[in-house]
Amino acid sequence: MNTYAFNRELRLLTPEHYQNVFQQAHRAGSPHFTIIARNNNLSHPRLGLAVPKKQIKTAVGRNRFKRLARESFRNTQHQLPNKDFVVIAKKSAQDLSNEELFKLFDKLWHRLSRPSRG
């Protein structure tokens, strides 16, 4: 049975983890956020978040975006390939509803999961 937890092993934790993703990465983007992915040598995908204060001004907005990104990742982690993902928020992300964000996340997760994406 699959577990849908989002524990420590599913997160990018150190600056080195993030730097590895930014080198030779594949991107899937929208006007609201970008997801960058790179293959890892682990048996599971990992997620990192970058939500700049310059893009989403309020802490409530940043926390909402991060919460929805984690939840979307948590629900789709078993369909995702073994890659490290970094989600980078853009200013217009705060204008979307929760439902619109989830749909957009699903679309971009699917795009990055295709075999032709490295």
Curated annotation (Swiss-Prot):
It comes from the Bacteria. It catalyses: Endonucleolytic cleavage of RNA, removing 5'-extranucleotides from tRNA precursor. The keyword Isomerase does not apply. Its EC number is 3.1.26.5. The keyword Nuclease applies. RNaseP catalyzes the removal of the 5'-leader sequence from pre-tRNA to produce the mature 5'-terminus. It can also cleave other RNA substrates such as 4.5S RNA. The protein component plays an auxiliary but essential role in vivo by binding to the 5'-leader sequence and broadening the substrate specificity of the ribozyme. HAMAP family: RNase_P. This is Ribonuclease P protein component. It comes from Vibrio vulnificus (strain YJ016). The lineage of its organism: Bacteria, Pseudomonadati, Pseudomonadota, Gammaproteobacteria, Vibrionales.
